[in-house]
């Protein structure tokens, strides 16, 4: 089955930057990869920033916005069906900005996608300098953290207060009634210093759904 990874996070958190490093790692493992940019906007800037990754091991696809949510979800499913026929080793979905993870789970549970795809990992990229301004922002952040197998901290510097950030993330989870701590799911390292061993570990991050932790066996397939 084709493994599917989802990368979530606020606009500007560093999703596309992380994706560059991650996809280059997968290509070094001789895996065929397809990146699906899932966007509600008319023009996807991230798509343009990823063009340099395209080659015989990496393809780029896009689901563009317009219409209502149901229309967008139908486009999402149709695109995944077409991609499933290409027999990629791995598909990576990067939404632009806020994304409803329920759409991700619901779509992959539908036929024929459930026979072709298997969820690998859900990564949430969190800016080390994140400021949570209001409860709406806290709710959106928590909804992403609640599903991720790994929270990857971006834009780390010598001024980063990781303990304070952990407390803020746990506070967001508590806001939606998720009592599980984020601490063991945090990966904090300058993206420039992430090694292949780090990526191998990240590929077994898995995901959480309905407060249950699922562990990906992706690392065993390399």
Task: Please tell me what each predicted stretch does.
Residues 2-8, 13, 17-121, 128-132:
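Nucleotide-state-sensitive switch-loop elements of NTP-binding domains
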Residues 11, 40, 156, 218-219:
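Hydrophobic pocket-lining residues within nucleotide cofactor-binding pockets
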Residues 16, 154, 214-215:
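Ser/Thr-glycine-rich phosphate-binding loops at phosphate-binding pockets of nucleotides
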Residues 86, 90-180:
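Phosphate/Mg2+-binding loops and adjacent switch elements
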Residues 158-160, 175-213:
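C-terminal-of-GTPase-core extension/linker across diverse P-loop GTPases
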Residues 214-222:
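Single conserved hydrophobic/aromatic residue that forms the stacking wall/gate
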